[in-house]
């Protein structure tokens, strides 16, 4: 005679915990903890142990996903940037090409000014940038993972301007883009002056005078 199956208890009938949701919650807590700590104590004093304690997770949870605090901070900062893009709208970020190079570069630099003045970005990005000046490995990672995608967009837009006859063909776009962004970065990082739309608009006007066909 077959043995009847016991009715499931109330406890066994409960759905299993969603490990994906739990992992995402832990990951988000680690991002927040890493960004908060690098602002509060600086990059050198930020540790995996400190991040874990702040996030309420074990060290092994962090080491399961990342190999170093630099990796944690890079991913946390990239995630912060992705959040900003989602808030801005559904369209993926791209350098505008309206046919007016000056207007397009001014538009992008104004958005950069907004981001640099956003408290969510300013403190952690300043801490990472300052450490990248003295920590060559971190500096290279900052350029490769955070800056290079944006630099490539500038290069592409300047090449399009060359094709349209707006920029001299012998100009190296990789060098030319620094006319726009390097003065802004220095002023922001070293507090040598205020950053504003007027400032970046002027940078564009001056730079394009030197890049235009003669």
Residue map of PLM features:
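Hydrophobic alpha-helical connector segments
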Residues: 89-122
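Tryptophan-centric aromatic hotspots in well-structured domains and transmembrane helices
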Residues: 65-66, 142, 185-186
């Amino acid at each position: 005679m077959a043995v009847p199956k016991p009715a499931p208890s109330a406890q066994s009938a409960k759905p299993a915990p969603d490990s994906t949701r739990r992992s995402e919650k832990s990951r988000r807590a680690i991002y927040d903890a890493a960004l908060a700590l690098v602002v509060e104590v600086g990059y050198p004093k930020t540790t995996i142990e400190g991040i874990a304690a702040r996030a309420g997770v074990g060290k092994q949870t962090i080491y399961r996903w990342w190999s170093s605090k630099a990796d944690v901070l890079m991913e946390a900062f990239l995630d912060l940037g992705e959040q900003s893009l989602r808030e801005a709208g559904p369209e993926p970020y791209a350098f505008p090409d309206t046919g007016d190079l000056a207007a397009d570069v001014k538009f992008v630099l104004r958005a950069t000014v907004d981001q640099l003045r956003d408290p969510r970005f300013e403190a952690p990005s300043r801490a990472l940038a300052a450490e990248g000046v003295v920590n060559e490995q971190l500096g290279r990672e900052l350029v490769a993972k955070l800056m290079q995608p944006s630099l490539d967009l500038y290069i592409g837009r300047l090449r399009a301007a060359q094709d349209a006859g707006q920029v001299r063909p012998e100009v190296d776009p990789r060098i030319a883009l620094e006319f726009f962004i390097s003065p802004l970065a220095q002023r922001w990082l070293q507090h040598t002056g205020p950053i504003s739309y007027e400032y970046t608009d002027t940078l564009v006007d001056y730079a394009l005078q030197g890049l235009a066909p003669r």
